[in-house]
Amino acid sequence: LDVNKNFITTWRVNANDKIVLPFIVDQYFQGNYNCTIDWGDGSETEHVGGKNSIAKRPEHTYSQAGDYNISISGKCSYFVLSANAYSSTYPELLKKLIKIVSWGTVEAGGYGFGDAENLVEIAEPTKKTFIKCEDDSFAYLFAGCKNLEVIPSFLFRYVNENTTSFEGTFERCEKLTSVPEELFENAPNATNFEETFAYCKNLMTIPTNLFANNKQSNNFKKTFAGCTKLEKVSYELFDSTPNAINFDRAFY
């Protein structure tokens, strides 16, 4: 597996489980997939997409229980567990994703891992990769990943500089105890931090300079609401956010 080029995720399956990848397959997303999938169990690789829209989401059945690395190379623009059409159809699959091993370079445009409740590990990007969201938003990207314990310090190292929203990005990540100080430093135009860490009920500390480079931010509504184990908050936390006007229930 080429961890530099491939988008690699780990899934924990039982014998005869079927994994269906959360591709968006309707006509409005034609041309957004032209990739090869290695299912990680020694089976033949599968090519998906091209000029025409794919007819259905890629799927694969595993004969034996275990943890399998699914590797995607090529163009994979959308991988959205939280899309209603996927999450409502395959709710059991949200529990089977356990790691993001590598982001690769797959021309990603919009990804979402909301309610992947057993996701425990997120890779740190090594190149400009999935972080170039077309809608300039990371809203609810990892919301409900309740077993995620650590956020990589430079997860958003290569963020689109025009990114404006981190609304609910880590909402309900219940095992987080701390947040890296450098997390948002490369998003100088971010304005919306509503519910970013809301209901992270084991969060104990917030770095003083978390928003030091987010001078355009104006919305901190419920940013840390429900963070009942916070030990203290620095008086200087919002010193670099002169445009902030909404602190409604920021620490409620």
Segment roles from a protein language model:
Residues 1-252:
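Solvent-exposed loop and capping/linker segments of extracellular ligand-binding repeat ectodomains
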